[in-house]
Structures are given as C-alpha cells and as structure tokens.
Design a protein with these regions (language model features):
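Cytoplasmic-side transmembrane-helix entry/capping segments in multi-pass membrane proteins
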Residues: 92-102, 124-126, 147-157, 187-194, ...
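Small-residue-rich hydrophobic segments that form or flank transmembrane alpha-helices
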Residues: 29-97, 156-161, 171-232, 236
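Short, strongly hydrophobic alpha-helical membrane anchors
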Residues: 3-27, 268
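Small-residue-rich segments of transmembrane alpha-helices in multi-pass membrane proteins
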Residues: 56-65, 101-108, 132, 152-165, ...
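Interfacial loop-to-transmembrane junctions
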Residues: 233-256
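Hydrophobic alpha-helical transmembrane segments in multi-pass integral membrane proteins
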Residues: 67, 108, 112-113, 118, ...
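Transmembrane helix exit motif
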Residues: 79-89, 118, 124-149, 236-237, ...
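A helix-boundary/kink motif common to multi-pass secondary transporters
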Residues: 63, 117, 121, 184, ...
Length: 268
C-alpha cells in the first residue's frame, strides 16, 4: 500500500460521503474507540508504546492516511489537555533542543508523503523499536551511564517528527532518546506532551495541502472527540500514581506491542 493522499476512500464511499459525511461502519468504531482511548492514555508518557498503536489498529478498518487524518482533531484536544495537566513539569531547556529537530522531521514527512510506501515505513519503525528493546534487555544501562550524545538525539528526534507525520508513530524514536535520560514519570510525560503538541500542531497545514482534512474525516473525528478527555484523564492518573519502575515496564510493554504490530504490517 502506498500513502497517496488521493487514495483515501473508494469512489462509492465518496458518493456516500456526499449525502452523509460520516463513517457509519460499526467495525470501524469497534477498532477506533479503543485506539482513541489508548492514544489518550499515551499523554501520560506511554506515547512510545500504546499510543503508537492507534493508527495501526484503526488501519484495520480504514487506510493509514485516513486514520491519521481522523485522529488530527482528537490529537489536538488531547495535546491541550496534556499540556494543562503537566504545565508545571516541562523541561524547557530540553524541549528547546528537541522541538526544532522534530519540526525538520515533519517537513521531510510532508515532502515525501505521496511517494512513501506505508509498509516500508511500518517495518522500519517496528524493527527499530524491537532492536531498541533488545538492547535495553540484553545490555541494561548502569545507573551511572552517560546520556546519549546529542547527535544521536538529533537523528532520533528528526525520525520521530517524520514517523509522527506519516502515521502518528513518533513515540518510539523519541523515547529511544529520552528513556536513557532516566526522567521521572511526570517529567517524561510532560516532555512528551509538550513535544507532540508542537509537532501535531505543525501538521495541520501540510495535511490540508495533501487533501487529508476532508469533511468526512473531520465529521468522524467529532464523533470520537468525547473519548479524548477520558483517555487523557486515565493516563495522567497513572503517571502521577505509579512508581517509576512500573511506569517504564509498562512503557516497554507498549513499545513491544507496537514494534510487533508495525513489523507485522510491514511484511503483510
């Protein structure tokens, strides 16, 4: 499957959308509702794991570009709620380093969007995620291990912006850089929330330019929008109440599931 912006819905679906601009397939909502809740929970800092499953799960019912477009308004509301919840916990110095590289990644994603092969992108992100987890398991870092070099952080953050633009799967690359920093759960969550607020906000004009923000996708997004506060509330409660050890274990589990699902999508 190729990520052509024009290949979002079939001609029959387009004619149906004119009379009723909303997805009505029950199967779509059966996969979209848990996907949106997972995405909300990701605003607690689990974005590298469970949140990155949202588009692959929704892609069981619609195309990857359409799933990404439907989630845009939902993501904006979630990002605003996450910013409000963690407004006192941002590391502004760290974000000043991350955000410019992330924006470079979104520009690259926008320029290459029409010619990218979705399966190749999914497979590469999946392989990278699983290799990162294997490295953490086989060669666990010592407590006094230095943080990753900034040049590696720049590469991973550009990759995060790129994969976030293509399929809202920017969590694994960014987390591969941020996790070794050993931030507290709340600080980790605040960093992810602020970074992806800026990245997701920057996608709106390119998505409109690519023709992804049509009325059918936006109307469907409005139906899913009430789930956003529920997911974010669940995620914030988790980030503020669980221990750092359990937090990172859950994060790794989410990344494992994401890596396996993306790898599966890449080769099937």
């Amino acid at each position: 499957m190729r990520l052509y912006a024009t290949a979002l819905v079939s001609p029959q679906s387009e004619r149906h959308a004119v009379s009723f601009p909303l997805i009505t397939d029950p199967y779509f909502y059966a996969v979209a509702v848990p996907a949106v809740i997972m995405l909300g929970v990701s605003k607690s800092g689990f974005g590298a794991g469970f949140g990155s499953l949202a588009v692959p799960v929704m892609a069981l019912a619609v195309t990857v570009p359409q799933a990404a477009a439907i989630l845009m308004p939902v993501l904006l509301l979630m990002d605003l709620l996450g910013l409000a919840a963690f407004r006192r916990d941002f590391d502004f110095k760290f974000l000043k380093f991350l955000i410019p590289f992330g924006l470079v990644g979104t520009v690259v994603g926008a320029l290459l969007f029409k010619v990218l092969d979705a399966k190749v992108v999914a497979a590469l992100v999946g392989i990278f995620t699983l290799l990162f987890l294997a490295q953490r398991l086989l060669f666990p870092p010592r407590p006094d291990s230095p943080p990753p070099p900034k040049w590696l952080g720049a590469i991973l953050t550009v990759t995060s912006g790129f994969t976030s633009f293509v399929s809202h799967a920017g969590g694994p690359p960014l987390s591969a850089y941020v996790i070794p920093m050993r931030l507290s759960p709340v600080k980790f969550a605040a960093t992810m929330a602020a970074f992806f607020f800026v990245i997701n906000l920057s996608k709106w004009i390119p998505y409109a330019w690519l023709g992804l923000l049509d009325m059918r996708n936006m109307a469907t997004s409005l139906v899913l929008l009430p789930l956003a506060p529920l997911g974010v509330w669940m995620g914030v409660r988790m980030a503020r109440s669980i221990s750092p050890v359990l937090f990172y274990r859950l994060l790794y589990i989410g990344m494992l599931l994401t890596g396996c699902k993306l790898l599966w999508d890449g080769f099937h």
